[in-house]
Regions:
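Glycine-/charge-enriched secondary-structure boundary and capping motifs
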Residues: 1-8, 13, 18, 76, ...
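Glycine-rich anion-binding loops of enzyme active sites
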Residues: 1-47, 166
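Active-site glycine-rich loop that binds ribose-phosphate moieties when present
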Residues: 10-22, 55-73, 121
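Short clusters of hydrophobic/aromatic residues that line enzyme substrate/ligand-binding pockets
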Residues: 21, 45, 61, 188-191
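Internal active-site segments that recognize and position negatively charged phosphoryl groups
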Residues: 30-36, 64-88
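Short secondary-structure transition/capping segments
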Residues: 36-50, 151-161
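A short, charged helix-loop
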Residues: 44, 49-65, 115-117
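A short alpha-helix capping/helix-coil boundary motif
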Residues: 49-50, 70-73, 128-130
Length: 194
């Protein structure tokens, strides 16, 4: 993420034979998971650079940790997967569209850093956890029968993996405090430059 006049991007593409994780395999009834904490990179972007909060979250923005080894293990059984680069709401919707499915997400279940509520105003929380990208955590779906395996992988890598919802046959819905919730953010749009 840059506000400067120049941006350089490098892309490497490769395929692990017979273990391809795509966006298009989610099935109705599969659980939705995320790795790590969501919203930290966006928090760094919106907080004043002179604050303790910015200093605390800065590493999440400038040095995200790719979940490569964890992703390789997930490729054994996950039905779909995407990295959270454009915001959880947008990236999860990409899985749903590619899979021709819907989803239900419990916003209360989306994990944030333990100090998130200390440094980020409540009014900015949605923008960070649903609309903010650059976390590069994984959002994936898996059959319920893999719940124990997912817990074991979480322990093995010492990376939190949290169930945040379920794939539905149609529609996109969110709940917050056990009530229907309509997010006001949609994620990063590369063509708008937001």
């Amino acid at each position: 993420t840059t506000k400067g006049p120049m941006s350089i991007s490098i892309t490497l593409i490769g395929v692990q034979k017979n273990k391809i994780l795509t966006r298009s395999g989610a099935k109705t009834g599969h659980d939705i998971y995320v790795t790590g904490n969501i919203g930290s990179a966006r928090a760094a972007l919106i907080l004043d650079k002179k604050t303790k909060g910015y200093k605390y979250f800065r590493k999440s923005l400038v040095m995200p940790l790719p979940r490569v080894a964890l992703g390789l293990e997930l490729s054994e059984f996950a039905s779909s997967c995407i990295d959270i680069s454009d915001g959880l709401a947008k990236d999860l919707k990409s899985i749903a569209i590619s899979s021709k499915k819907g989803f239900q997400v419990n916003v209360d279940s989306i994990p944030t850093d333990p100090k998130f509520d200390i440094y980020v105003k409540a009014s900015l929380k949605e923008q960070c956890i649903l609309g903010g990208g650059e976390d590069y955590e994984l959002c994936f779906t898996a059959n319920k029968k893999y719940a124990r395996k997912i817990n074991n992988i979480s322990s093995k890598y010492k990376i939190k993996i949290t169930r945040i919802g379920v794939i539905k046959s149609t529609g996109y819905s969110y709940s917050l405090n056990s009530k229907q919730y309509n997010p006001k953010v949609s994620g990063y749009d590369h063509f708008k430059g937001n």
